[in-house]
Amino acid sequence: MSDNVPTIAAVATAPGRGGVGVIRISGKNLLPMAQALCGKTPKPRVATYADFTDADGQAIDSGLLLFFAAPASFTGEDVIELQGHGGPVVMDMLLNRCLELGARLAEPGEFTKRAFLNDKLDLAQAEGVADLIDASSRSAARLALRSLKGDFSRRIHGLVEDLITLRMLVEATLDFPEEDIDFLEAADARGKLDGLRRAVDDVLANAQQGAILREGLNVVLVGAPNVGKSSLLNALAGDEVAIVTDIAGTTRDAVRERILIDGVPVHIVDTAGLRETDDVVERIGIERSRKAVSEADVALVLVDPREGLNEKTRAILDALPSELKRIEIHSKSDLHAHAAGGFGTGAETVIALSAKTGDGLDALKRTLLREAGWQGEGEGLFLARTRHVNALKAAQEELSLAALCGNHQIELFAEHLRLAQVACGEITGEFTADDLLGVIFSRFCIGK
């Protein structure tokens, strides 16, 4: 980083009242600030009890002062932490005192961004920090910690090293352009490429599992009005999150709920019945439902077996994207016998279900996990993001194109290897545009 880097400060603990609150400060040459704040010059990595004072020397609070000298700190800069009492007024007064002494308020994720720019973390590890904080299940927390500790990064660095080795081998042959020699075969470049492709496939498979655990599955409930969508949402959520009546059109807006199935987040939207209406409020809800459908991974199509595919249900099915996965749900199975087979909804799976008794719920949950592609938490998994999966797919594609190169297309072969390396480097931040960094770190909380 540049030498002309401002000192930043922020409250590092969650908003609200608590037993302890922490102010984090990062910058260069922070000992004078510590002296002004506490009247003491702290020793590195030693907790010092002190009064935190204002400009007039009046005590604001008292607590622990910790100093981490550069480069042995989280950000790679001098870092001070003030651990005081966790009241919002006290934290605000302490933070304002830091700003008076020359710090500026940190932007979201700026501490972690500085750690990345100072080579304390790579980009995948930095994202692991945010994912650990945002983890919605124990499985997600465990896998995020693996990413933070560098498990994912080490896999990527291994791929990059193998790519560099193969590139050096192939590019060295460009100095010998004799047409009667197959350098790709002579150097076993194709054999090494096959090994690389298998390694990328393995990392990609793990990343896809990690992305499922982080991103989850988007599910919409669709069906004719009063077919039982809200009852099913309540049954899945284990709570009364949607109003249930016998009146068609009770759900006038899309109702959203998030549940966990085997640690995998499932985002469920109970759509307002997709139909034409003169009601202005209901029409807005229906438009929101259509948007939810366009973003869904799976549609649960509820059908009353006594009625089958009536005109309203057919109209709803016609409005669904043709590529959207569908699971056909025969609702209210406690009231009538399950119809054999499906009703031609385009679903590969048909489940008879009673939201009232719970029959069929476990089968539905298992089916949702299968549709998500979740294979269960195993060894070697790490939390990943969609951008990681896309980068690995790009690398996979470049290696596939390299495999198609003819025996004497060495320059093209080498170029595909280079592009595969660039794709892998985007994951760890070796090749990453500044605007992408801005997006990634802006989603962190302030103080991290």
From Swiss-Prot:
Gene3D superfamilies: P-loop containing nucleotide triphosphate hydrolases (3.40.50.300), Probable tRNA modification gtpase trme, domain 1 (3.30.1360.120), tRNA modification GTPase MnmE domain 2 (1.20.120.430). InterPro entries: G_TrmE, GTP-bd, GTP-bd_TrmE_N, GTPase_MnmE, MnmE_dom2, MnmE_helical, P-loop_NTPase, Small_GTP-bd. Disulfide bonds: none annotated. The keyword Oxidoreductase does not apply. It holds the Pfam family MMR_HSR1. One of its GO terms (molecular function) is metal ion binding. Exhibits a very high intrinsic GTPase hydrolysis rate. Involved in the addition of a carboxymethylaminomethyl (cmnm) group at the wobble position (U34) of certain tRNAs, forming tRNA-cmnm(5)s(2)U34. Belongs to the TRAFAC class TrmE-Era-EngA-EngB-Septin-like GTPase superfamily. TrmE GTPase family. GTP binds at residues 226-231, 245-251, 270-273. K(+) binds at N226, T245, I247, T250. This is tRNA modification GTPase MnmE. Binds 1 potassium ion per subunit. Keywords: Cytoplasm, GTP-binding, Hydrolase, Magnesium, Metal-binding, Nucleotide-binding, Potassium, tRNA processing. PANTHER family: TRNA MODIFICATION GTPASE GTPBP3, TRNA MODIFICATION GTPASE GTPBP3, MITOCHONDRIAL. Its EC number is 3.6.-.-. Its cofactor is K(+). SUPFAM superfamilies: P-loop containing nucleoside triphosphate hydrolases, TrmE connector domain. It is found in: Cytoplasm. It is an enzyme of class 3 (hydrolase). Homodimer. Heterotetramer of two MnmE and two MnmG subunits. One of its GO terms (cellular component) is cytosol. Residues 216-373 form the TrmE-type G domain. Its main location: cytoplasm.
